Every structure is written in structure tokens, then in C-alpha cells.
Amino acid sequence: MKALDLFCGAGGAAMGLHRAGFEVHGVDLAPQPHYPFTFHRGDAMEWLLDGYDFIWASPPCQAYSASTLALRRAGKEYVDLLAPVRTRLRACGTPYVIENVVGAPMRGHTVLCGTMFGLRLLRHRLFETSFPICSLLPPCQHKGDEIPVYGHGTPSWHRGRYDRNYSVGEKCVAMGGSIG
């Protein structure tokens, strides 16, 4: 089975799709030299969706992220592709998941955290699916030794709790060996 990973970045979601048995194809505007599977440089909003059994989309989150709130309040605008992505995916008929940050206007979403799955990853994300998912998920297990993973380093408002920025390697281990 083939999965399409839109806005793939370095491949964090791709690794999970691979572990679930999919042949993964990632699409991103930016070069991703470390993407672990088949990579296509292109516009996720224009990429053909035919021929895939499952589609994962992680559109840019800056329009909703807590880490950009001060900049947004100061007037900075970020691209918001969430609604157009949802429209495209609904129209194509292929099962899909859209992933984004807490604060994004997701529909019927589920909140997942790395600690729910035995990882040291403190990272809450929202998941909107085209299919029902089990609501019998384990609760978050925040014990105090989790590593927060954000887009580009640990935000200053979060560093007080963790005392430092964690290395890419430490974040990779916390995420179960994948980067994204």
C-alpha cells in the first residue's frame, strides 16, 4: 500500500507510516536531503493525489502555533493552508489524516502526545481524520523527564522549565528515532 506524506519535512510522520507497512512518498517545497523514503520536491497543494491508498498532511502550523503568537499579534501574517488542504483531501476520497498544532481549527480532532505511546516526547498535536479512530487512547504520561520538540528549538517561554535547548539527537531519540 502507498501513502502520500504532504508537507513532509524531514519525515517524522513518514517513519510512522513506514512502520505501519506503507510505501511512503513525501512531498515538500523545500529540499529534504535526509527524508528516509521516496522524496518529491513539489507543491503539496498541486501534487496529484491519485494512486495512493492513504494521505497524511501536515500543513504549515505557524498561523496557529503558540510559538508565533507574539509575532502574529504584532501583525505578522503566516500562510494558512489548513482549510484548502481539508477541501482537497475531502474531494479526492482517499482516507486521510491532517496533523497540526493545538490551536488550529481542526474538525472532530483527537489530541495525541508522544508520552501516550511510551516516548519521552512532550508534543501535543491535533489529528483530524476522514475515518473514525478509537477513543480508548491512554492518557498523557507527563512525568517531568519529557523533551519538548518544536519547529526550530525550544521557545524562550518554555526554556525556564527545561533549562536548555535539547540537541537534534536528543529530540530524535525522544521521538522514537524519527525526525520531523
Label each region the model flagged.
Residues L6, D28, R41-F54, C61-G180:
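Class I S-adenosyl-L-methionine
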